Amino acid sequence: MPGREYPPAGRPTADPPVPNQGAGADGEQFLDVRTRRTRALLREAVLRLASQGPVEDIAVADLVRAARINRTTFYKHADSPAAVLEQVLYADLDRGRAELLADATAAELPVREIWERAAGVMVDHLERYDPLYTAGLVGRRSAVLHHLLVDHFTASVHALFDRDPGLLPNGEGQDAWRADAYSRFVAHGEAGLVEAWLSLPAPRDPRLFISAATSALPAWLVTRS
């Protein structure tokens, strides 16, 4: 669910590298071959290193060595290893949210079913990048990954409010402030569910996360004011 009217704090603003899905993905068809190759090298290197330990522990020197590029080239694409990883993961999360919202809007699905499907998309994302999420979130070792998930869930709840403003509870303060406050409230809880699920021994049951993420939704989010 896009939620672009409410950009999360700390979100990277640079043109992001994305998971390897071909030159046509997310505008990369407009980039020259050298730039696409550099981005692919950075993607592969940061995902490999972040699967071995928290991204905060990765030095620029380690990343450029693993990617086989120099520092000057690196700083043309990002200002830190964490920024490279954020760009990769945000691109995957945003793509899943956008596709889900398009399908949900076309089918006029209720919020609970949308969120259940969204939880399934999140499980797919977590399993796709399982080593790095396990390395970073089990034991709360990576604030970067925690904040990334909070930002994602915040934007997702904002998107539900955009889709149906009647979901926003009445109360003190302007609508924009309440939308932001309630979105953050739900987002922190959902991020906590992710961390709790990841703390389980593998193989983890996707149905457990989907059920918990849906059951934890507050009543005001699934019923109109």
PLM regions and their residue ranges:
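C-terminal peripheral helix-coil segments that are non-catalytic and often amphipathic
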Residues: P2-A23, H158-G166, A179-D180, A187, ...
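Alpha-helical structural segments
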Residues: R37-R48, Q52, A66, A83-D103, ...
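Helix-turn-helix
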Residues: L49-A83
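Short, hydrophobic secondary-structure boundary micro-motifs
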Residues: I58-A59, T134-G136
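A short secondary-structure junction motif
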Residues: D92-E99, D103, Y129, Y133, ...
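Hydrophobic alpha-helical connector segments
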Residues: L101-P131
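Amphipathic alpha-helical packing segments from all-alpha helical-bundle domains
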Residues: G120, R140-P169, W177-A191
